[in-house]
Each structure stands twice: as C-alpha cells, then as structure tokens.
Amino acid sequence: MRDRTQCVAVPTQAFNEILDQDGQLTAYAQRLEQLRERGSHRVALLRGELARIRQDQVLGMPEKRVQVAAHRLKISEAQAVARQCKTEETQLVRKAVARVRGLFRDFDCSVRDAMREQRLLLKQVATVQHTSASSDQREHCLAQLRQCKEARHHAYRSLVEKSAALRNGKMTFIERVVRALREYSFNFDATQFFLANGLYIAIAVFFIACIVVAPFSGNGNLLTIPNILTILEQSSVRMFYAVGVAGIILLAGTDLSIGRMVAMGSVVTGIILHPGQNIVTFFGLGPWDFTPVPMAVRVVMSLAVSVALCVSFSLFAGFFSARLKIHPFISTLATQLIIYGVLFFGTSGTPVGSIDPYIKDLFGGRWILGTMQGTLVTFPKLIIPATIAVAIAWFIWNKTILGKNMYAVGGNAEAANVSGISVFGVTMSVFAMAAVFYGFGAFFETFKANASAGTGQGYELDAIASCVVGGISFNGGIGKLEGAVVGVIIFTGLTYCLTFLGIDTNLQFVFKGLIIIAAVALDSVKYLKRR
C-alpha cells in the first residue's frame, strides 16, 4: 500500500528529480540527441553560421560566396540525414512523451491522495474542541495542502517543458492553452479578483438587466447601434473633462472648478461664433458682432480664448497647491467661486444664443452611414476629437517623462523631490494640461446647447466620479488613463439606460451615488491591503 503522507512533503522540484532519475526516459533522450546531432541540430547550427557569414563586413564577396555555397551544401546533407532519421525520431518522441505523461499521472495521483488525506484531517480537527494543539495541527494541514498544490503545479510545468524539449522545442496548441489555464488557476486569488473587478461585474450585470428589461417596458430594444452611438456621442465631450482631471487625481488632488471653466469657455465660444449681433454684454461692454471676421479665424479665436482662459485660472489654482501646499480641493473651490461670480455677474446669466449652424454641423453634427432595419444610422462627429484627445493624453501618460513623473509625484511627492524631480513643475504642468482639455471640451460643449453662466453645472462631479470608477485612486500614483475613459462611458451609459427605461431623473442620482461610494470603498480597501 502506498504511503500517502510521504507525498505531502515532496518538494516542488520532486517531479524533476523523478524525470532525471528515470532510466528509460534518459535512454530515449540520449537516442534522440544522437539522431538530431547530425540532423536537425546540425541544420540549425549551420543556418546560424550562414547568417553570420552573410552579415560579416570583413569577408570579401568572392570568399563570402564560397563559404555560403559550402554551408548550403552542408545544410542539404544535414537535412537529408534528418529525413532519414525522421521515422525513428517520431516514434521515440511519442514513446518518450508517453513515458513522461505516465510518470506525471503517477506523481499527480499520489499528491492528490495526500491532499485528500489532509482535507480529512482538517475536517477531524474542526470537530474537536479548539485548543492550541488543534490550531497548530490545522495550520500544519493547511501548509501541507499548499505544498501539495505547489507540487502539482510545478509538476505539470515540468511535464510541458520536458515534452516540448523531447519534441525539439515544439509545444502543441492544447498544451499552451491548458498551461495558461492552470497558471491562471494557480495564481488566482478570489479576494483580489473581486476587489479589482467586483464593481465592473456589478455594473455589467446591471447593463445586461437593462438590455433584457427594455423590450418588456415598451420602449424598444436598448442594444442597438444608434443607441450605442448616442451613448458615445454623449460621452465624447465629457471625455475631455475626465481626461483632464484624471492627471490631477493621480497627484492625489482634485478639481472642483471644471464646471465653471466649461461655462466660461462655452460663453466665450458662443459669443464669438454667434451669427449676427449677440445680446450678451460683459460688465456693460458689448454686445458684439463677429460676423465680419472670417469664419476660420472666429473658430480659431474662440478655441484659443477658451483654452487660454481655462489655463490661466487653472495655473492660478495650481500655483497655490504647488507652492503653498494648499490642497487642490480648496484652491480649485476658490477658483470655481471666482469664475462663477465673475461670469454670472458680468453676463447677468443671459444665454449667448445659438451659434452659426454651419459651424455647429461641421463640428457637432453627424455623418449619415445608411439605414439598418429601417432606421437611419448616423455617426457623431464629436467622437473624432474625443478619440484624438484620449490618444494624446495616453501618449503623455505612458510615453513621456512628464507621465512617469506624474506617477512618481502622486505616489510619494517627498521621495520624488529627493530623486531630483521638480514637484512644483510637475504639478503646474498637470494643472495646465488639464486646463487645455477643459478648454477644448468647453469649445465642443457649445455645439450641444446654448451656453450660459449655468452651463456645466455638476460636470466636475461626473468627471471625478468617472475617474474613481475607472480605478484612478484618490491616494495618488495609482491608475490608468483607460480607466477614466471607461468610467465616462459607464456613467453616460448608466444615465442613458435609466432614461431609456423611464426612470425618474432624481432617482438616477441614487444609482450614481451608490456606484461612487462602492468605487471609493473598494479603492480604500485595496489601499489598506497594500499598506
């Protein structure tokens, strides 16, 4: 009868020792090496030498041609030997691989027997009264189970590696897939998985439920191309705000002035692009009429002024945070109030009116793609600039020195300063970069609705929430830009789905609040676990 407990203490390399000590397997491997020495191995060696000869800059062309011809002849001879040995080699490989698998089955069976025994012991320990000795025995059983699990994992890895070596380095597709699955299963941690993906799983279930319920609500099918494109269109402009504030959150900060900056840029854009004389005055100045100015100049002017104003106010807030160490929550709150007061008092809250219809269609219109099942399908133009903005931001985050420094400063500002990184410079750069995205977003916001001092109300909360849901930590130094993008789409899709199903607008805030608190709670748990 097999001694089961002996297998429990087998080290993780025990199966390798079994393979090395098996005489029959060693004989197979030696014979295969002999067959390949003058065949496939020699072909590979000669091809390597041939490549070096061709790249040699010292050899003259006549000498190089002679050596190339000689090596080609040797390669042909080695290939002929390999073909002669092919049948015997194939049979040996089949027998050797079968031998390895047989040894693995025996080893795996013995380890599984030991694991069953340890599980039985654990059950017995659980039934007895809790004492110090029983606690020690339980820990011992758990340690033995972990050791057995590692032994099985390393044994299977050795099985695949040995089989590939016997096949001269070749691995079957099935072996690759099974090995990947077993590696994932071995390293899988349910707690970490649900901490990282639990919120997304819950949101995915919610969206699936909405898709299933929608036809029964009498509102039609939710999962259609026009609806998806509408969600992406509504996400496009808000993508600028989330991408901008994401950098500030990465520095363990926040920005409460987004909505007011959007209003400021939108009002300026609306005034400049309005057809004819505008009714809006600013501190008694105006009204203005920019129609004599060429349209291209007006577009560039409105965009430049929107970006310049946003950058100015953002740098104002950033200076107090970077130089005086005032938390961005306070500095951006002050900026928000300043912009709101100046803008509302200066314009009396008067809407700027519509903008030139040609420009509105040029930037904010749609391209007609055709019809699908009797429904006209159009592609929103706003998706294009949003995609470009995300691509530029991704490049800055991942491919530039500023991006690397953002993670360093966000993770530990003091350590970054000691290592020679200018914390002040990085902070100011991030605030300026965020403002550029706000300015562009405010410019495109004008094409959605008439701008006024109240435009953008609450946008900062949606942008910040999108970043948090996307995995950008408030603790700083953790997160990816892609997360902010996904967060924007999730929140926009959530609002669209609830509206599509006829859910009251006020009740939608409840769903948003639950998602935000869940995201922040999971982020806090992950942060505490890392500490």
From Swiss-Prot:
| Entry coiled-coil feature ranges | none
Supply the source organism for this entry. Treponema pallidum (strain Nichols)
The entry's function note states: Part of the ABC transporter complex MglABC involved in galactose/methyl galactoside import. Probably responsible for the translocation of the substrate across the membrane.
Its name, as the record gives it, is Galactose/methyl galactoside import permease protein MglC
Keyword Kinase, does the record have it? no
InterPro entries on file:
ABC_transp_permease
Lineage of origin: Bacteria, Pseudomonadati, Spirochaetota, Spirochaetia, Spirochaetales
Give the family from UniProt: Belongs to the binding-protein-dependent transport system permease family. AraH/RbsC subfamily.
* Superkingdom, natural source: Bacteria
Q: Which residues cross the membrane?
A: 193-213, 239-259, 267-287, 300-320, 326-346, 376-396, 424-444, 461-481, 483-503, 505-525
* PANTHER family tied to this protein: ABC TRANSPORTER PERMEASE PROTEIN YPHD-RELATED-RELATED, GALACTOSE_METHYL GALACTOSIDE IMPORT PERMEASE PROTEIN MGLC
Q: Which GO terms describe its molecular function?
A: transmembrane transporter activity
Topology versus the membrane, per the UniProt entry?
Multi-pass membrane protein
* Subunit composition and interactions: The complex is composed of one ATP-binding protein (MglA), two transmembrane proteins (MglC) and a solute-binding protein (MglB).
Return the GO cellular component terms, semicolon-separated: plasma membrane
Where is the protein found, in the record's own terms? Cell membrane
Question: Keywords assigned by UniProt?
Answer: Cell membrane, Membrane, Sugar transport, Transmembrane, Transmembrane helix, Transport
Report whether Cell cycle shows up as a keyword of the record: no
Q: Name one Pfam family in it.
A: BPD_transp_2
